[in-house]
UniProtKB/Swiss-Prot annotation:
One of its GO terms (cellular component) is nucleus. Transmembrane segments: none annotated. This is Probable kinetochore protein spc25. Belongs to the SPC25 family. It comes from Aspergillus oryzae (strain ATCC 42149 / RIB 40).
Amino acid sequence: MASSFEPSLSTSGMRPPLTSADAPSMADSLPSINFGFEDLRNRMAQFTARFDAFIEKGRKQILEERNQFKIGLAELQEDQRMKQRDIEILNLKSQTHDQTIQKEAAEAAEMHGTIASVTMERDSRLAKRDRLKQQINETQKAINQKLEAQKAHARHLDAQARLNIPELEFWQDYLCLRIEGAGREDRLKFIFSHLLEKDWEAEAWFELGTSSRDYDVFHTRPKVDRDALNGELDILNEDRDFGAFLKRMRRLLVEKMQQKRPTI
């Protein structure tokens, strides 16, 4: 480093007195000044080099930081894009999950409805089965009662038949009557002869139904008025006097035959 200029060093007190012969010239009497330009130039060059190095280093640092910022920004953008994609995927999954839940809820509701319908149908069938069982039991009971009544009636008819055989034979002889089948188990055909004095071969008959307790007449020859038949049947079903009924039927048939034959 160059030494600075010090005026105190140029004072005369610092030098010995000079003679006139030895006195320096005016130029020689001027102080010797060393500004240190070379050192200053070197120092400026060093400063410039250091400054340029600092600037270059700063520029490189700025470029590196900018590159790092760009890289970080790109990474952040990529991360944001990935997160956005993840969000979209999650939203899609959430929508799918909601749709699945709604579908399962609808299926569950439909299943509950089906179960309720099946339960109602089962209960209805069980109630119907119970009613049918009750009806079957009641029908069976009625059938049993009817069978017992028919058996009792059959026993009664059998006993009555045994008692009435002599009486029936009497009426057959007395009324010129014979009994035949009418083509059905529950019908009998009663045929009368010797009805007309002028035509002993002429016959008349009627079919009697015996399927129930009350008797009924289905056919007659000659044809007898229905009102007259119903009157005779009412008497028979009330008093159960079969012999008297046969006599009345013979009389009705004779009257009908006499009405049809011309008088001479």
